[in-house]
């Protein structure tokens, strides 16, 4: 290898190492800070806002109103657990059985990819990472997930998730969603309303809370059944999530 190539390689390696250190400090600081402080915005919110501006849409505002778990109906927490991650109270950030099932499904159905992200993983990637699919992103997501699972309580993870989740175009967080779609605070959401909000989470830009399709209504009904099978509100109290 020539001297010039070695110089370039050495420069790139030093740059990447320094970048990794900076990102580790930034993300580590974020995990520590948001273990107690309200989250003002997420990476997804920033990405959506910048994308809107680049497309000339200056009316778009990624809106979110932070509320504590005490200000969120327990039905809402139960609904997202029933819909997205029923093992949330027990796992350490990853649902290994669901990952294995998703991998087996994706091998058989290459055109219908199934995910297996837990609420902890979704919180990590929505809060800190860019949109997209890559092994690099997955690796960073895994590290961040372990970080928040180590530092945050399960109740804190659920609170952050509910406050940064996307429920529609420009609608982030359960308080903004409750006000937009039901004209009430998140604390007053009913079991049915919570299930409807959770039903659009796989793709909130495609599925609409304001105009639910047959699929969304079917998913809402399924979530309601799962909420009942989990034990209803006592489930949240049992796992200290309310």
From Swiss-Prot:
<comment type="function">
    <text>Peptidoglycan polymerase that catalyzes glycan chain elongation from lipid-linked precursors.</text>
</comment>
<dbReference type="GO" id="GO:0016763">
    <property type="term" value="F:pentosyltransferase activity"/>
</dbReference>
<dbReference type="InterPro" id="IPR001264">
    <property type="entry name" value="Glyco_trans_51"/>
</dbReference>
<protein>
    <recommendedName>
        <fullName>Biosynthetic peptidoglycan transglycosylase</fullName>
        <ecNumber>2.4.99.28</ecNumber>
    </recommendedName>
</protein>
<dbReference type="GO" id="GO:0008955">
    <property type="term" value="F:peptidoglycan glycosyltransferase activity"/>
</dbReference>
<keyword id="KW-0997">Cell inner membrane</keyword>
<keyword id="KW-0328">Glycosyltransferase</keyword>
<feature type="transmembrane region" description="Helical">
    <location>
        <begin position="19"/>
        <end position="39"/>
    </location>
</feature>
<comment type="similarity">
    <text>Belongs to the glycosyltransferase 51 family.</text>
</comment>
<dbReference type="InterPro" id="IPR036950">
    <property type="entry name" value="PBP_transglycosylase"/>
</dbReference>
<dbReference type="InterPro" id="IPR023346">
    <property type="entry name" value="Lysozyme-like_dom_sf"/>
</dbReference>
<keyword id="KW-1133">Transmembrane helix</keyword>
<keyword id="KW-0472">Membrane</keyword>
<dbReference type="GO" id="GO:0009274">
    <property type="term" value="C:peptidoglycan-based cell wall"/>
</dbReference>
<keyword id="KW-0812">Transmembrane</keyword>
<dbReference type="GO" id="GO:0008360">
    <property type="term" value="P:regulation of cell shape"/>
</dbReference>
<dbReference type="GO" id="GO:0005886">
    <property type="term" value="C:plasma membrane"/>
</dbReference>
<dbReference type="Pfam" id="PF00912">
    <property type="entry name" value="Transgly"/>
</dbReference>
<dbReference type="InterPro" id="IPR011812">
    <property type="entry name" value="Pep_trsgly"/>
</dbReference>
<dbReference type="GO" id="GO:0009252">
    <property type="term" value="P:peptidoglycan biosynthetic process"/>
</dbReference>
<keyword id="KW-0573">Peptidoglycan synthesis</keyword>
<keyword id="KW-1003">Cell membrane</keyword>
<keyword id="KW-0961">Cell wall biogenesis/degradation</keyword>
<keyword id="KW-0808">Transferase</keyword>
<keyword id="KW-0133">Cell shape</keyword>
<comment type="pathway">
    <text>Cell wall biogenesis; peptidoglycan biosynthesis.</text>
</comment>
<dbReference type="GO" id="GO:0071555">
    <property type="term" value="P:cell wall organization"/>
</dbReference>
